[in-house]
């Protein structure tokens, strides 16, 4: 009797102070009309089938919500979207592999996934064609991220000439990238596209690019010089913020506006050409 009473007191104490009680999670289920998921003993979620994932909300929680047993996610060929709020709070999620069939990532899909640092892709052009939801969203975030193309870590990037735009957050925080060559087919670079690429030293931007988003090269601390394309009309918020080794920049005559803190922290910037 005393033993049972003691156990009850422990349970009640946990509830009062807010200590979470761990329950056994399901290991398989559906996450779309034609999609299923499985969780193995190593903490890997595999999503397979065809079509779109369900879009979740905070009142319609994903089966993966706040699941700290998930270490990696593999999304197989045939899956076309990652649902909104799909992996919110998966604090131990460290890597994700996405297929070339993926075309959309829903808003807040990876919110509070602070350890998500490795992204595996199989096709660069298809990766850069992914659309993101209306909410501020990304796959990788922060710094010290790793991008792998066919299991090889990406360092130098030559964007395929079938690509027409580089989406927001595309290479955010990928610290291994040293140089990027962008083809004439590209017309825009999205917000934070190369933000926190700490090893990025060289970017070749063609004159076909007429829009460069806010924060696009923010915190690229190894970038030393850059020439902006002749058709852009503004320099966005914090575009080169804290590019501490940037010493030379060539600006086009088309510039009519420079937004807040565009060159703040560029302590070595002494050569500006127009």
Where are these regions (language model features)?
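Bacterial N-terminal signal peptides
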Residues: 9-18
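Extended Gly/Ser/Thr-rich low-complexity repeat segments
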Residues: 53-69, 171
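Short, T/G/N/S-enriched strand-turn elements that build extracellular solenoid repeat scaffolds
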Residues: 36-38, 85, 107-111, 130
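Structural signature of tandem-repeat unit edges
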Residues: 42-51, 68-81, 91-104, 114-130, ...
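Consensus positions within tandem repeat domains that build extended binding/scaffold surfaces
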Residues: 83-86, 106-109, 167-170, 190-195, ...
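Sec-dependent signal peptide cleavage junction
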Residues: 18-27
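GGW-centered surface loops in extracellular recognition modules
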Residues: 26-46
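Bacterial N-terminal signal peptides that target proteins for export
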Residues: 1-10
């Amino acid at each position: 009797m005393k033993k049972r009473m003691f156990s009850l007191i422990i349970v009640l104490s946990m509830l009062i102070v807010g200590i979470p009680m761990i329950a056994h999670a399901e290991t398989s289920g559906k996450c779309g009309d034609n999609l299923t998921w499985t969780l193995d003993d190593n903490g890997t979620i595999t999503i397979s089938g065809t079509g779109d994932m369900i879009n979740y909300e905070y009142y319609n929680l994903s089966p993966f919500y706040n699941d700290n047993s998930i270490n990696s996610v593999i999304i197989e060929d045939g899956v076309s979207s990652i649902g909104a709020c799909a992996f919110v709070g998966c604090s131990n999620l460290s890597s994700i592999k996405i297929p070339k069939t993926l075309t959309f990532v829903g808003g807040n899909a990876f919110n509070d996934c602070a350890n998500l640092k490795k992204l595996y892709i199989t096709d660069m052009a298809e990766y850069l064609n992914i659309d993101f939801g209306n909410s501020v969203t990304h796959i990788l975030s922060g710094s010290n991220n790793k991008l792998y193309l066919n299991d090889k870590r990406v360092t130098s990037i030559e964007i395929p000439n079938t690509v027409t735009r580089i989406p927001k957050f595309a290479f955010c925080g990928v610290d291994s990238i040293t140089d990027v060559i962008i083809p004439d087919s590209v017309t825009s670079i999205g917000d934070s596209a190369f933000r926190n690429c700490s090893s990025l030293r060289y970017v070749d931007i063609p004159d076909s690019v007429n829009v460069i988003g806010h924060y696009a090269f923010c915190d690229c601390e190894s970038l030393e010089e850059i020439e902006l394309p002749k058709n852009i009309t503004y320099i966005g918020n914090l575009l080169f913020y804290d590019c501490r080794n940037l010493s030379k920049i060539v600006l086009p005559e088309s510039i009519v506006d420079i937004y807040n803190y565009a060159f703040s922290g560029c302590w070595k910037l002494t050569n500006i050409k127009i």
